[in-house]
Amino acid sequence: AVYLNLCTFFESGHFPDHTSNIYDMFSSAMIAPLSDAQQEFLTVMGLADEFTVEMALFITGNQEAGQILSLMTRQNAFITPLPDGVSFRFHHMMKECTQRAFAMLSHEKQADFRNRYGQWYESQGQFLQALSAYNKALNYDAALAVIQKDAGILLASLSPEKVLAFLDACPTEILKNRPLALLVLMRRMFTWHQIPKMLELKQLLTDTIAEDNTLSEDERKNLSGECDLIMSFLMYNDITGMSVLHRQASSKMTRPAISIRKTGSWTFGSPSVLMMFHRRSGTLDAELTAMNECMPHYYRITQGHGQGAELLMNAEAAFMQGNFSDAQILLEQTYSTIASNGQHNISLCCDFLAARLSLFQEGVTFVKNPEVKRKELLSLHNMMWMNIFDSTYAYYYALIRMPEKIPALFKDHMLSTVSFLSPCRPMMEMIENQVFLSQKMYAKVIGRSETLLPVCEKMHYELVSLHVQIQTAAAYAMLGKHHDARQLLQKALGHAMPDGFLIPFVENYTYIKDVLSSINSITP
């Protein structure tokens, strides 16, 4: 600010008064004296948060971009080299001024540069940045191509409102020209609980399959089969019902699904497979059998997406029943099955089980110091993986009563700031309940559970509901309301015993032991 004031004084003979615009002062002092080529360089590259010389060459189309950047970095403290030795960043004041200058360019020039940004980010696999650039350039076809490439993986981190706004703006004919992108969007609409929009997109896809004469018969069948695969999610957590459509899809398809990537999320962000698919009390054995029979059909058309899920579900079931050695063997089999096949989601779910199992069984592989793994996950740029990782350590540290070590997302109760996919939110809320218990915020647990239990019932989340009932009973017990605690525990026992579930009671035993001992019978 002092420098800008002095510049104004030397130019005009007086210091600026309180009505002066700081951005105008900055532009006059730092940008206006530069050559046209330098000004254009700043104007265009000001859209980037960070950039390299290679990126600047591509975006500006100026072969002297490297020399310009080198000169300006030496002469201008408002362009900063970053510690990696190859990237640069504008000072926020410079960035604001150059973005204002960019807004003064013609619409054609703006669109041209934004398309270049889109092409650059797309080539680097930075699909969200590419999508944003193409969207601002109104290049809907290129944006849909990016959505298809991403297969909904990074798209999941956007708010539903942003994607719905994009769909409202995108012409129908352009949507119909990208049937594979429609499939990706259908699946994402399901995870955001936007079912009417999902069905609307399905109709567009059906029309395309019927009307597009350029499609071969094989591709029509592949698209129809992949549509069956996506529509199976409407029967989510009914394993047998989903598998009917998986087998139907498998009979039509001659290629793997394109709208579901092998490396993408399988659990929608849930840290547990069993919590997703245990639907009714007393049906555990049938659910495990169905999962074992159904998953091979799904793997065939998705190149092994979610591979190991059925093994992990069996491991979790054994753990829940207190069969720790069986659980450990199945867990190690799952780790071995998914080794080096890119199934980060299932691996993180294995870690969730390992964390809990390590409290009961010796020799369980569980990383007590999570910082190295956190850095590895951050390099993948996938917030869903980070959220599963945080949920594991939140639950673990809540169980061992070390709330100070719980990751900030859960410790500071910031779940409302995260755009979780709807199938995983009840699990995250249940884990936050356990955190509240460890923080002795018992009334909070009771108040939240009144809202969470009906959601679990509606989604057929029997196991999540069981956890929440026990947590609520624990909170009542800690507040001295033993009658309320006893009623909830008796109800929970009635739900748990047909499947032999013990561990949710054991994990909360410190809170409920006095009330539990007062219950005469634990048979349902």
Sequence positions of predicted segments:
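Amphipathic alpha-helical segments of tetratricopeptide repeats
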Residues: 74, 131, 151-152, 167-172, ...
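Amphipathic alpha-helical "lid/sensor" segments that cap RecA-like P-loop NTPase cores
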Residues: 1-21, 36-40, 46-50, 61-62
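Residue register of alpha-helical TPR repeats
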Residues: 44, 112, 180, 219-222, ...
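Internal alpha-solenoid helical repeat scaffolds
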Residues: 174-350
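C-terminal non-catalytic interaction modules
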Residues: 427, 434, 443-447, 451-524
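C-terminal leucine-rich, beta-strand-based interaction scaffolds used for sensing/assembly
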Residues: 28, 32, 48, 53-96, ...
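Helix-turn-helix repeat elements of alpha-solenoid scaffolds
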Residues: 108-111, 124, 152-165, 193-211, ...
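Extended alpha-helical scaffolding segments used for macromolecular assembly and cargo binding
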Residues: 100-181, 185-188, 197, 201-204
